[in-house]
């Protein structure tokens, strides 16, 4: 049965005992409202580690002033039930006051990796992500930590953070988990209207169009961006906020495509902002 831990002190006590006995720990950092994408990461951890910890913490530092912190779905009882079914050992669900007992004396600034794409539209977002992930790594001391490739920029930033701060953890990127029709699973999908849900499938279809263009030899980013944008404009009512081509994981905007890239989309529907991406090309 999955154990619910609600304080940093108790979590650290468990971790210290586990480390003394040579136990391996896997961590899946989440903000809750779990879906099959999260559960895929839990299953991967359970198959690899002696102890699997799922953190459920809605981190206020990664929400902007006009974003949905208060409205973000919170369903800890359901989350606990879901991860129990797939074998998680611990759900770490601390209070904000426990994670941030006072004003932070040191600000974490990510730098150039956070100046593009999602980071450019949400200033300070990735500073908040890196702050909380650093704290979780220090509290849980995982051997492996699992992140979804759906948030590809976040994954690249966390991998750089691990390198820069010498964290003794291996980051495992998990492929995007999709609905049967191709829509990337997301906690925010519940905000879509019935019509928007039908339209949202075209995000993944537009990425498959981009992949086909690349496979046919197209290497001009503008051509791919224009074709994807045209496709989306003719199939969705949401506002297209971004269609971009960047190197991966360096996150440098590409004009003439060389090497590994990721194509990123962001679309704003009435009450949900959806992102999706595809990573293609040689490393």
Swiss-Prot record:
GO cellular component term, pick one: cytosol
Residues that, per the record, bind beta-alanine: 62
GO process annotations (BP): pantothenate biosynthetic process
Disulfide bonds: none
EC number(s) per entry: 6.3.2.1
Cellular location(s): Cytoplasm
Protein name: Pantothenate synthetase
UniProt source species: Staphylococcus aureus (strain bovine RF122 / ET3-1)
Organism taxonomic ancestry: Bacteria, Bacillati, Bacillota, Bacilli, Bacillales
